[in-house]
Amino acid sequence: NSNHRVTESRVQKYNNLVKDVPNTKLYASIDSWGKQAEYIRHGLDIEHFEANLIRLLAQGIPVGIMCTYNFLSIDNISEFIFKMAELKTQFGDLLTVDMPYMVEPLHLSAQICDDSHIHIMEESLKEMELYPFTTGEIEKYRKTVGWIKANRFKGDELVKHRKDFWAFVKEHDKRRGTNFKEAFPHLGMIGFNNET
């Protein structure tokens, strides 16, 4: 599994090592796209990630993208889906996408979402159906959205995990010099922003 932070020469070295090995596939983890992905996976440079991803795909190396779908994935999921569709259009079945839901930590799980977040997820699922994803990829995302809708936290449990989420965000920004509201400008404007 890779986050594609390695240099171009190391990507080429990897390609040279595996190009003749049958059934080789590289898995890369990313949970959103753009500045949101960079916030979630601190240290990620999305342009570098994309360049390395394209380098591998262009040389015929199959890549599986693993998006561990969490609360922070929701805000920019449409851009992630569009980018994956763009790459799938260019490279076909060399690129696969899997979007299982995150269960823990609970305060980052999409189970803390509200109705506006559910709407974003449902709309993004409709968008995904318009692009060249496989039936299996769409159904896995449909399952993720369905599971989140059926398992949203309620009552005291919801309040606790949302408070823990905001405590996490504040500590993340303090320790890493990041800015949640810059990375997620819309997330702070919908849902439970008033709880901050």
Segments the model singles out, each with a brief description of its role:
Residues 13-14, 42-45, 79-84, 113:
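Short secondary-structure boundary/capping segments
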Residues 20-21, 52-63, 87, 91, ...:
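A structural motif corresponding to the C-terminal end of an alpha-helix
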Residues 127-196:
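Radical SAM enzyme core and accessory elements
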Residues 1-10, 17-50, 62-71, 94-108:
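Core AdoMet radical
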Residues 69-75, 91-125, 138-146:
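Flexible glycine/acidic-rich beta-alpha junction loops that bind and position SAM and/or redox cofactors
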Residues 15, 50-54, 81:
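Short, well-ordered alpha-helical packing segments
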Residues 71-87:
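Catalytic cores of alpha/beta
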Residues 37-41, 66-68, 107-111, 129, ...:
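Active-site rim elements
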